[in-house]
């Protein structure tokens, strides 16, 4: 409603409305760095080492900041891929930022000075490393101008610029003035920050902060990614550890990358090198997919394929009512070529050569069917011809098993501590059987899976202690990994020349 008397027709330009994103049931958590230095009062916002829900690009700018420097601020790549995607946006996502611009943390010791020229009471300069809370503007004589009284500070995320505007019409900031501010120092961030931990005083950080997601927001993490960091063996192994029984209950699937440069600064820029690196560094977890190389879009943005894979896994899940029955393989991605590093000579490879990667448990991206697509539906544990647990052959198999166990726990956790009557036992069986039949009907499972309450698995001692168990054996539907048709030549068709008699 108007807060002043109006008479006539008026028009007002309001706040930006973010491009809508499809709301998926899949819950990915990204761990990395965000430009929270661009968020005012970041120290009180609870945006460091905590899961933050992001629903749009504008939402990200408000909560964690945004920068086009994805190398420094790795979480911005995920934000862009989910909420500025030419193929369609999808979310929400959760991010855990480990960058802490506080004094003594990830902040440069020496302050930065910047000469400003004010025109019409306004000045603007580019910086995404500035800690906005530390900005001061010196007077030409002595002392500093006062923010909120003499001037206001804003940030343009589209241009990456700081905007300073005078607040007093009769005493505007003018001419040449000097600004002083602190900047973030991302060189201080290490694998250990991403891995994180839990202190004796109950402080969570890095991957360990995923454990805060359910008790604080009642969301169940089922995908974990750390683009820009997951190529580190230490981080990858920590991701595999974290993804098992989060909060003692939830299972998640890891999506990671292989590096373009190894720990000795040697390029990993060929298929042969990538396969060798994967084996040497044991990137073989059955609860994970690994990708190599990276990819570039038409604006020269360089994406980790793990990020694009999470986007397409969410999109595929959404198309099946959040049931992870379809791989992200052969799904279009908004890129124009593969990327092997700034100085790499590799021009890329096709789908046929890409088979060398996929048969060694490395997913990739190729040009196929007139577009660029993700390629590969195996877990990292797969190697063609090797002895692999059948459940670990395809990513959909592992994710379906996780989906069933996670869903069982979410469905029946409200019944814990209720009387375990015969009626409740039967209700659990009937409901779970109904879901299994539904999975078969939609094509997520094959055969006739049955949930069983076995006497052999529910001893008198177990029942006496209130411990009950149900057993389910399922066959997740495999993807159509290959389709072959065999065509043979025959001379039988020549008989048409002799049909119908003489002419």
Segments from the language model and where they lie:
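Extended beta-strand solenoid/passenger and fiber regions
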Residues: 89-157, 184-185
């Amino acid at each position: 409603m108007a807060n002043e008397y109006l008479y006539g027709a008026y028009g007002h330009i309001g706040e930006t409305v973010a491009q809508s994103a499809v709301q998926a049931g899949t819950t990915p958590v990204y761990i990395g760095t965000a430009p929270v230095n661009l968020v005012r009062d970041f120290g009180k916002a609870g945006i460091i080492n905590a899961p933050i829900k992001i629903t749009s690009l504008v939402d990200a700018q408000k909560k964690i900041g945004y920068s086009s420097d994805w190398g420094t601020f790795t979480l911005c790549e995920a934000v862009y891929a989910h909420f500025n995607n030419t193929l369609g946006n999808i979310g929400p996502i959760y991010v855990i930022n480990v960058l802490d611009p506080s004094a003594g943390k990830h902040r440069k010791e020496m302050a930065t000075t910047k000469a400003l020229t004010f025109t019409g009471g306004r000045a603007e300069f580019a910086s995404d490393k500035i800690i906005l809370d530390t900005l001061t503007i010196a007077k030409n004589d002595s002392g500093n101008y006062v923010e909120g009284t003499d001037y206001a500070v804003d940030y343009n995320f589209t241009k990456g610029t700081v905007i300073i505007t005078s607040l007093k019409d009769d005493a505007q900031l003018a001419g040449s003035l000097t600004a002083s501010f602190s900047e973030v120092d991302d060189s201080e961030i290490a694998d250990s920050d991403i891995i994180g931990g839990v202190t004796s005083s109950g402080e969570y950080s890095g991957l360990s902060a995923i454990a805060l997601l359910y008790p604080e927001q009642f969301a169940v993490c089922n995908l974990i990614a750390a683009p820009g960091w997951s190529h580190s063996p230490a981080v990858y192994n920590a991701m595999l550890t974290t993804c098992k029984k989060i909060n003692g209950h939830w299972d998640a699937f890891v999506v990671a990358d292989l590096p373009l440069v190894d720990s000795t600064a040697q390029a990993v820029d060929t298929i042969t090198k990538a396969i060798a690196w994967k084996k040497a560094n044991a990137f073989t977890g059955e609860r994970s997919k690994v990708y190599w190389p990276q990819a570039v879009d038409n604006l020269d943005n360089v994406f980790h394929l793990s990020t694009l894979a999470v986007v397409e896994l969410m999109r595929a899940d959404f198309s099946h009512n959040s049931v992870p029955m379809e791989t992200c393989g052969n799904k279009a991605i908004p890129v124009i070529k593969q990327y092997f590093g700034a100085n790499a000579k590799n021009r890329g490879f096709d789908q046929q050569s890409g088979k060398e990667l996929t048969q060694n448990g490395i997913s990739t991206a190729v040009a196929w069917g007139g577009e660029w697509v993700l390629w590969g539906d195996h877990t990292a544990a797969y190697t063609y011809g090797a002895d692999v647990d059948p459940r670990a052959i395809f990513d959909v198999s592992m994710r379906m098993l996780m989906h069933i166990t996670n869903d069982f726990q979410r469905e029946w956790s409200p019944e814990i501590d209720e009387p375990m009557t015969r009626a409740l036992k039967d209700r659990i069986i009937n409901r779970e059987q109904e879901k299994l039949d539904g999975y078969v009907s939609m094509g997520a499972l094959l055969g006739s899976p049955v949930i069983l309450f076995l006497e052999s698995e529910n001893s008198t001692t177990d029942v006496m202690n209130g411990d009950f168990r149900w057993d389910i054996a399922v066959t997740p539907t495999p993807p159509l990994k290959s389709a072959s048709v065999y065509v043979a030549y025959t001379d039988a068709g020549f008989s048409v020349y002799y049909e119908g008699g003489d002419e």
